[in-house]
Design a protein with these regions (language model features):
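Active-site mouth loops of central-metabolism enzymes
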Residues: 1-11, 61-69, 150-160, 211-214, ...
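An alpha-helical appendage that flanks or caps ligand/catalytic pockets
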Residues: 103, 107-144, 187-317
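Internal, glycine-rich beta/alpha segment that forms the wall or movable "lid"
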Residues: 72-203
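Hydrophobic faces of well-ordered beta-strands that scaffold small-molecule active sites
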Residues: 3-7, 28-30, 56-59, 86-90, ...
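Conserved, mostly hydrophobic/aromatic
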Residues: 24, 47, 78, 117, ...
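N-terminal beta1-alpha1-beta2 module of alpha/beta enzyme domains
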Residues: 1-59, 152, 331
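Active-site-adjacent beta->alpha loops and helix N-cap segments on the catalytic face
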Residues: 37-45, 180-195, 334-339
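Short, acidic/polar
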Residues: 9-20, 74, 158-167, 307-317
């Protein structure tokens, strides 16, 4: 199985990209969540100039964040800096939109966006709509400014539902999901993609998760494991705290953790400004104060924690399910965590 990393965009991220490339990792991504992280295209431009082999991606952008022409120009510009190494990840903007106090895009809007960006990045004209006006648009500055010759890989984010997976199928794109360790769930996503377009090409499947390799006799739910995986657990709790319907689907212990999180952040599930309280520090290393919210059952469900032997067995099972690349977000000591990932999958 291939291995990659995803990080928050910030100054110095290019140094991590260089180290990831030196370790032989396959991809390096940055998030696109403007209200909590730096700009991903600025970050990847630096990474493109500093690296030579590793694939570089956005994980993921959204039609609610950028117009299709603006997004296509950004990706095609990156492709001019790192020809054939760019991954365009696209989703409904579930988190990026919620940090604005808004809801995510619907699947139909997602598909229109992917289609338009694929067309433009492939050097083809596409339909661009603003209200009732529709125009055919194309790059007028193709050449030195952008690269529409080398292919860009397209990947669609799908969490559990089949709609986004079907978009990936119809657009011949890959799939990416976060914290989805259930082989049956992955099988369902792959089937939804295949059923939507049986004859279309299919891209790779990417699993984004957190990883903690246990030392001998280490507590799998101790402070070190919670610090390494807590950002992923907290992302689920923040989503549930922001979305009462999602919280209702959780078990009693998880709902209690959501209640404590809301109380700790001095907000409620219905407060109009709750997003300003729930998302600061999103997908960063958790604080020691929040370790009690990192429930063992959620750690097990969302992250990979175990001895090297245990983890290799689990990863082999995931690979048999059809996952092509394991992507982790290192938060405690990124260079060391990336080295451990490379050693684990060597």
């Amino acid at each position: 199985m291939r291995a990659g990393v995803v990080v928050a965009a910030r100054p110095g991220v290019e140094d991590l990209a260089v180290r990831a490339e030196e370790l032989g990792l396959d991809s390096f991504r940055v998030y696109d969540t403007p209200m909590v992280h730096g700009d991903p295209f600025v970050a990847l431009s630096l990474c493109a100039k500093a690296t030579r082999r590793i694939r570089l991606g956005i994980g993921v952008t959204s039609p609610a964040l950028r117009s299709a022409p603006a997004a296509a120009s950004a990706f095609a510009s990156l492709n001019a800096l790192a020809p054939g190494r760019i991954i365009c990840g696209v989703g409904t903007g579930n988190t990026a939109r919620r940090t604005l106090g808004m809801g995510p895009t619907r699947a139909a809007g997602l598909e229109d966006f992917v289609t338009a960006v694929q067309d433009l990045c492939g050097g083809r004209p596409t339909a661009y709509r603003e209200g009732d006006q529709v125009r055919d648009v194309r790059f007028l500055h193709a050449g030195a400014h952008v690269n529409t010759t080398d292919p860009i890989e397209f990947v669609v984010a799908a969490l559990h539902g089949p709609k986004a997976a079907a978009v990936a199928g119809r657009r011949g794109a890959g799939l990416i999901s976060v914290g989805l360790l259930d082989p049956a769930a992955w099988q369902a996503l792959r089937e939804a993609r295949r059923n939507a377009a049986p004859d279309a090409p299919r891209g790779s499947c990417y699993l984004v998760t957190a990883l903690h390799i246990l030392d001998e006799d280490e507590d799998p739910h101790g402070a070190a494991a919670r610090d390494a995986t807590g950002h992923l657990v907290m992302s689920l709790l923040a989503y549930a705290a922001d979305t009462p319907a999602a919280a209702e689907r959780l078990g009693p212990a998880e709902r209690e953790a959501v209640r404590r999180l809301l109380h700790r952040r001095s907000t409620t599930a219905t407060a109009p400004d709750r997003y300003t309280k729930l998302y600061p520090g999103y997908l960063d290393r958790i604080t020691p104060r929040d370790r009690d919210l990192i429930l063992p059952e959620l750690m097990t469900a969302l992250a990979l924690i175990g001895t090297p032997e245990d983890l290799r067995t689990r990863i082999a099972t995931l690979e048999q399910t059809g996952i092509d690349e394991l992507v982790i977000q290192p938060v405690t000591d990124p260079p060391t965590e990336m080295a451990h990932l490379a050693q684990l999958l060597a």
